[in-house]
């Protein structure tokens, strides 16, 4: 299919630091709290909660941890009120960057995000300065395994309403519209498939190739952002050099 998700080249870097430092469950737990407060504790009637639970399971979050987060948001346990904010700006060499945060202190979050930008030669911008370069898309990532036929999986995904299907080195990447994400995910789940990733994310219209020096600076910026407990997601349009390792 046309287009490239660049999941391993770019998106695999997102989450690597989280997993390494044990932060991913905390961040998903906050997403669950927000989803429950907005739409209630039943995944059957709360599409956003269904999506977050799918993301949690794709990240191997234990069921009891998921349930505890739901109870916390339902008022059965003490819950914090979080505010959702998206910061926009430019990384080194003008890389377009979106930073989603869930925070109980927006002044703290704004200061931390601004520091991450400026430390590596970037700068925060005004609302709308780069968001027009991205589209909200569903992305489902499936690990390649023996017995999983690529053509069958592609037809399964496209028949369910997927927009695109990519085969990469170790994974298949299914892209959907935001509206069809839940339908496609549920259709693939019904076939017994497990996901490495299943979530709505901001995907750039085009990618910008960067050199190794810029990649090193930008990865440092990503590390600082992703190590912040308030930061939920970081999206960008940088294409790292082939074979580059931090």
UniProtKB/Swiss-Prot annotation:
<keyword id="KW-0963">Cytoplasm</keyword>
<dbReference type="InterPro" id="IPR029072">
    <property type="entry name" value="YebC-like"/>
</dbReference>
<dbReference type="GO" id="GO:0006355">
    <property type="term" value="P:regulation of DNA-templated transcription"/>
</dbReference>
<keyword id="KW-0805">Transcription regulation</keyword>
<protein>
    <recommendedName>
        <fullName>Probable transcriptional regulatory protein CLK_2466</fullName>
    </recommendedName>
</protein>
<dbReference type="InterPro" id="IPR002876">
    <property type="entry name" value="Transcrip_reg_TACO1-like"/>
</dbReference>
<dbReference type="Pfam" id="PF01709">
    <property type="entry name" value="Transcrip_reg"/>
</dbReference>
<comment type="similarity">
    <text>Belongs to the TACO1 family.</text>
</comment>
<dbReference type="InterPro" id="IPR048300">
    <property type="entry name" value="TACO1_YebC-like_2nd/3rd_dom"/>
</dbReference>
<dbReference type="InterPro" id="IPR026564">
    <property type="entry name" value="Transcrip_reg_TACO1-like_dom3"/>
</dbReference>
<keyword id="KW-0804">Transcription</keyword>
<dbReference type="GO" id="GO:0005829">
    <property type="term" value="C:cytosol"/>
</dbReference>
<dbReference type="Pfam" id="PF20772">
    <property type="entry name" value="TACO1_YebC_N"/>
</dbReference>
<keyword id="KW-0238">DNA-binding</keyword>
<dbReference type="GO" id="GO:0003677">
    <property type="term" value="F:DNA binding"/>
</dbReference>
<dbReference type="InterPro" id="IPR049083">
    <property type="entry name" value="TACO1_YebC_N"/>
</dbReference>
<dbReference type="InterPro" id="IPR017856">
    <property type="entry name" value="Integrase-like_N"/>
</dbReference>
């Amino acid at each position: 299919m046309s287009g490239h998700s660049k999941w391993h080249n770019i998106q695999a870097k997102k989450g690597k630091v989280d997993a390494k430092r044990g932060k991913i469950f905390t961040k998903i737990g906050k997403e669950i709290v927000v989803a429950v407060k907005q739409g209630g504790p039943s995944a059957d009637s709360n599409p956003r909660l269904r999506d977050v639970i799918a993301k949690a399971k794709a990240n191997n979050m234990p069921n009891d941890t998921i349930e505890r987060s739901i109870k916390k948001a339902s008022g059965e346990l003490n819950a914090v009120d979080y505010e959702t904010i998206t910061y926009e700006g430019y990384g080194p060499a003008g890389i377009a960057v979106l930073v989603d945060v869930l925070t109980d202190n927006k002044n703290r979050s704004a200061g931390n995000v601004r520091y991450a930008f400026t430390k590596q030669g970037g700068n925060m911008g005004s609302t709308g300065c780069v968001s027009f370069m991205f589209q909200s898309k569903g992305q489902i990532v499936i690990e390649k395994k023996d017995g999983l036929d690529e053509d069958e999986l592609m037809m399964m995904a496209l028949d369910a309403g997927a927009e695109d299907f990519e085969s990469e080195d170790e994974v298949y990447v299914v892209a959907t519209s935001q509206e069809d994400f839940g339908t496609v995910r549920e259709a693939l789940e019904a076939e017994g498939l497990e996901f490495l990733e299943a979530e709505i994310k901001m995907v750039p219209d085009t990618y910008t190739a960067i050199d190794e020096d810029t990649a090193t600076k930008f990865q440092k910026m990503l590390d600082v952002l992703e190590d912040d407990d308030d930061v939920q997601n970081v999206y960008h349009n940088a294409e790292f050099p082939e074979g580059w390792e931090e």
